[in-house]
Amino acid sequence: VQAGETVNDGTLTNHDNQIVLGTANGMTISTGLEYGPDNEANTGGQWIQNGGIANNTTVTGGGLQRVNAGGSVSDTVISAGGGQSLQGQAVNTTLNGGEQWVHEGGIATGTVINEKGWQAIKSGAVATDTVVNTGAEGGPDAENGDTGQTVYGDAVRTTINKNGRQIVAAEGTANTTGVYAGGDQTVHGHALDTTLNGGYQYVHNGGTASGTVVNSDGWQIVKNGGVAGNTTVNQKGRLQVDAGGTATNVTLKQGGALVTSTAATVTGINRLGAFSVVEGKADNVVLENGGRLDVLTGHTATNTRVDDGGTLDVRNGGTATTVSMGNGGVLLADSGAAVSGTRSDGKAFSIGGGQADALMLEKGSSFTLNAGDTATDTTVNGGLFTARGGTLAGTTTLNNGAILTLSGKTVNNDTLTIREGDALLQGGSLTGNGSVEKSGSGTLTVSNTTLTQKAVNLNEGTLTLNDSTVTTDVIAQRGTALKLTGSTVLNGAIDPTNVTLASGATWNIPDNATVQSVVDDLSHAGQIHFTSTRTGKFVPATLKVKNLNGQNGTISLHVRPDMAQNNADRLVIDGGRATGKTILNLVNAGNSASGLATSGKGIQVVEAINGATTEEGAFIQGNKLQAGAFNYSLNRDSDESWYLRSENAYRAEVPLYASMLTQAMDYDRILAGSRSHQTGVSGENNSVRLSIQGGHLGHDNNGGIARGATPESSGSYGFVRLEGDLLRTEVAGMSVTAGVYGAAGHSSVDVKDDDGSRAGTVRDDAGSLGGYLNLIHNASGLWADIVAQGTRHSMKASSDNNDFRVRGWGWLGSLETGLPFSITDNLMLEPQLQYTWQGLSLDDGQDNASYVKFGHGSAQHVRAGFRLGSHHDMNFGKGTSSRDTLRGSAKHSVRELPVNWWVQPSVIRTFSSRGDMSMGTAAAGSNMTFSPSQNGTSLDLQAGLEARVRENITLGVQAGYVHSVSGSSAEGYNGQATLNVTF
């Protein structure tokens, strides 16, 4: 476009180039940045030469508008990816994500920088009246890269709006900048006469700011190495000078805020006159509206005024004197600092030498009491008081949202009081002989704290104990409320208030409390226990409640079933109602081995007085109470009270333990057996016999333990017996055989109660030794068999509530005789008669509810019957083996084996059985003795086979059944296999 020529509209694409010496209007440029942004190698796009003019140009992605010296453009709009390289003049450029590079000699006026746009003002370039709307999206003082305005040259009258940022590089200068809320100016170079209207100015190391005016919500931050001069801070403005920063000739107007520490340098004037912070010394500083002064270790501050919104932070080892605290002023300190001055109410306070006196901590204030130090008469009005041990002396007051945080063990021997609003006591441990006083309508929350005080006086409002252990009595006024939440444990009495126990909370009521526990309304989902440190005579405890709302909470009551009067802790419902469901857990506080049968209504555990009512189901028994021979159950009576009564039936352990005598003696008798149960081979040689027997044994229900009968039972047994002959000889026409045997066995029997319900199981592991003597008259065949046996029993009785173990010894003697008659050559009939006498001694023991003593047990048995069986010659003879060497020791088929069979019916009579089992103590009425009888008659049928399978080996099998026909005699069935080897 030649000089004097005008071109309207047009588009430059695909490396097109337009050289403008005249005037170009409305061009669209989409090419020119082939070598990247602001690269001198680019040759495309629109070039405005000396004297050339371009108006209303649109530069899109990849497009370049280059304005050389002497050229001028106006109203250019540059989109993302497009750029304007300026060495001439540009007016009213709009950067919609595009970039403007203002080179030396270039002047940009009225540029508007929108989101993601960037204006770079290089050394020797000038930008005036720029509006910056981008660059700070990453937050205050964040490095966002190439967005916003970067000044290496000069920027004049820049306006920085929300999200806008101006970065003044070390060689750059910004003059008369206005920064609004949400925008900021970052200064590494020079900033002159900046006005902060809600925006921020950051003066970095090496940067300077002069003449800054900080208006409402504006904030000037002078960082380490930064310098600010002649700053004016108006009402609600803020000047922050970091450690190592410098601000001089500051004018701090009323309501303006200074934020600094004694590691900075600040001088100027405030409403009190000249002030300074120089070389670790601060003087005459005013703190308000967010102002703050940190007095560091070893530094000092004098004549500090702390008004509403101001904060004075005196670090450990720092000193602040002549401090004047106004209403709303904040003090941060610990007991290692030295602070003195006046409170907002004009009263003097001090901190020093490990002693803090008369502190008043307003909202936001914080004081830390170190271990070994003392704080006297501290008032916390919404502030934070942290005690890392130490002692609270005088009256410590918490009001209006105050927090007292404990770590370690803190001692209070005086008064901790809450007068207004809410307060929180949390963590650590508060001990001593002091008291806690709660007044006012608010709530005091004690959380995660161990609190041990002389008393807690709940005069008004609510006390909430959360996840804490509190050991003290709570003395309350009616209309107040006490809440136990989380895993709180309260050890102390309560009198009187409305109490709520959450499901994980526990209230332990001691018998040495200063007052009796009385509660108005009790909402109960936790646990309540009566605790006692007394020894000697039992003294029942009482909890009195007007209204009880049970929410599956538990109350543990001590009961003395062995006492006729004054025998239980009580819950008293006084004039109100008991609703919901409360579980009563009963603790036997007496001799667990002793229990009396209750009389009348029973043992009272819930008493309804003054017209009180209790819902059906308001109380349930949480556990079985057993004492002596009795179970005790909870019952509601017509008077609305609740009682424990001994049940008519004995507890399940009575028949269970009584059956142990019978079970052990049954086993001994079965093991001993009789001669007809032993497999033998006539001859001159001794033999060894191995027998394995198992079976079922039990007793029918013949009235049960209440009628003196053996309890109903059913179970199994098994044993292995090894016996061997020691002597075989002939004496005066008689064959004499003597030997010994040993056995190991086990029995397991399920026992039933008198009502047919399961009582439990008795298991017995037994080991036995015995001897026998057998005499046979050779001429007549008359024989006699004598057996003596001893057994060690290890027994365990298991019920739903007990595992009871006992050991003992059983003995047995047996005399049996028989005379065989030959009916035919191979058939024999043998009448038999047997007498058995046995005894048992079991050790005494004790279960969870009583002692158990066993008297000596004994029984006598007579068996009469006969044996009918074959009587073949048991000589082994010759076999049919094809090998001569085996014909004397082997058979080819079963039919060649010598076999005898037999059957044995009998009648067994048991008589003179004895065996006492007693439970309880010697106290009158508590001891119960049971003597289950085993007397009775049973029918027994046994049958067996024996076969000789080798010259010296005989195998026998046997099965039998016993049926009780009268009394409590045993019944069952059995099976046995025997291996007999002669040698």
What are these regions (language model features)?
Residues 7-12, 18-20, 24-29, 46-48, ...:
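Fold-core signature of tandem repeat domains
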Residues 34-40, 137-145, 876-894:
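Intrinsically disordered, low-complexity Ser/Thr- and acidic-rich flexible linkers and loops
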Residues 770, 853-983:
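Outer membrane beta-barrel transmembrane domains
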Residues 595-613, 706-726, 852-859:
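Short secondary-structure subsegments characteristic of cysteine-rich extracellular domains
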Residues 459, 466, 483-485, 491, ...:
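C-terminal low-complexity, acidic/polar tails when present
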Residues 9, 195, 267-270, 338-345, ...:
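Extracellular beta-solenoid/beta-roll
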Residues 647-832, 837, 843-845, 960-980:
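Outer membrane beta-barrel translocator domains of Type V secretion systems
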